[in-house]
Amino acid sequence: MDTATILSHVDHTLLKPESTWEQIKTLCDEAMEFGCATVCIPPSFVKQAAAYVQGNLKICTVIGFPNGYNTTAAKIFETKDAVENGASEIDMVINNGLVKDRQWDDIAHEIAGIKAACLGRPLKVIIETCLLSDMEKIKLCQLAAKEEVAYVKTSTGFSTGGATREDVALLRENLPASVKVKASGGIRTLEDGQAYLDLGADRLGASALVGEARKQG
């Protein structure tokens, strides 16, 4: 798999709380130069970024990020605001407290409400695999498939761990072909990226891969 193909699966990401507009512009420029799938940026920059790229790049943003324990109403409002501001894709964080309490209906209701607020834009459900048992991961795959989301995403990158090869394989095995897998967190080399794609991931959340590609020349 060549570098360009790997980068075409990348959500070029900058979600640090101290991110500046100049850094976001650079991120967008890099993503357009290297043919990334999207940039994944904080909600506060979506409107500016959408105007800046003028339709030449998809803008992904995050909802309930990074802890996921916002109320469902707050997450739906965030989603509507992001869509209105020009977001092309939405990455939402589930409430893992609800997972631990086995409140599956509440989780499904939240996913459905946020998906409706996306107005047809792809929804990625971040499940934070490092906090979950395999049983919980599989159950969330089942819920996500039932709600017909676009992706299940491994991680925020802000918890105790990121993507692992074992988790990506587990998610892929427990999702229908219609629901894709996004691996995120700790993907630092192009070799890592290819390994996750080979395991069945379709999207990579990463901040380092464009820099790695630039070093290769």
Question: Language-model segments: what does each one mean?
Answer:
Residues P43-N67, R102-T129, G162-T189:
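Alpha-helix-loop-beta-strand connector modules within alpha/beta enzyme cores
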Residues M1-E84, I138-K139, L143-K146:
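Conserved N-terminal beta1-alpha1 strand-loop-helix module at the mouth
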Residues T61, F65, E84-V99, K146-G161, ...:
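Glycine-rich phosphate-binding active-site loops on the catalytic face of alpha/beta enzymes
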Residues C28-C36, R121-K124, E148-K153, L175-V179:
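Short, surface-exposed connector motifs at secondary-structure boundaries
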Residues M1-D29, A169-V181, I187-G217:
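Alpha/beta catalytic cores of nucleotide-metabolism and tRNA/nucleoside-modifying enzymes
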Residues A50, N70-D81, L132-L143, E166-E173, ...:
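Catalytic cores of alpha/beta
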Residues T79, E89-Y151:
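Conserved anion-binding
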Residues I6-L14, V39-I41, K58-I63, I90-M92, ...:
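Hydrophobic faces of well-ordered beta-strands that scaffold small-molecule active sites
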